[in-house]
Design a protein with these regions (language model features):
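Long, contiguous binding/interaction regions
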Residues: 2-60, 74-81, 101-102, 107, ...
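A short, glycine/Asx- and small/polar-enriched loop/turn
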Residues: 63-66, 112-115
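Short hydrophobic/aromatic beta-strand micro-patches
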Residues: 70-72
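Short, residue-level hotspots on alpha-helical faces of the histone-fold
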Residues: 85-88, 115
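A common structural junction motif
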Residues: 87-93, 139
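Active-site phosphate-binding and catalytic loops of NTP-dependent enzymes
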Residues: 92-100
Length: 153
């Protein structure tokens, strides 16, 4: 027992409170921002002729990201170009990747945007690493749902 008047004697255990609406609002805002970022990336890749674009929802499987975006390119030059286009288009909005790996070899470029990780492969490297198989428990999403339809760009 705590002596009367001590701080511990005045503390009452409260039942767990329901999360404040502002927390729910923040989570919704974050979800929308992450989805918008994924849409921007997939739209850019599609616009610049990336092949076999896949979006895998991995948030329930890992804390690394919410989405993996995987795409193929026809050559190392195409891989670098796709990486440049994505970085440039998101950069216009002040969004920079946390890191980019593999750019110098351009066999596989990884672009880490926090909640969205982009994997750009040459076809052979994609077949070899087979990330779709490694992350098969993730939810495969319809790529068409991530492509923004715009007017004449």
């Amino acid at each position: 027992r705590c002596p009367r008047g001590s701080p511990s004697s005045r503390v009452r255990l409260q039942p767990p409170q329901r999360r404040p609406e502002s927390q729910t609002g923040r989570e919704l805002k974050r979800f929308v921002e992450v989805k918008e970022r994924a849409v921007q990336i997939v739209t850019s890749l599609d616009k610049h002729k990336a092949e076999d674009i896949r979006v895998i929802e991995v948030g329930d499987l890992t804390s690394l990201a919410d989405y993996f975006i995987i795409a193929s390119a026809t050559s190392s030059t195409h891989v670098r170009s796709l990486s440049d286009y994505v970085e440039e288009e998101l950069g216009r909005q002040g969004i920079r990747p946390l890191r980019v790996e593999g750019y110098s070899t351009s066999n596989w470029v990884l672009m880490d945007y926090g909640s969205v990780v982009v994997h750009l492969f040459q076809r052979e490297a994609r077949a070899f690493y087979d990330l779709e198989r490694l992350w098969k428990d993730g939810k495969q999403l319809e790529t068409a749902d991530f492509i923004e339809v715009r007017g004449n760009d």
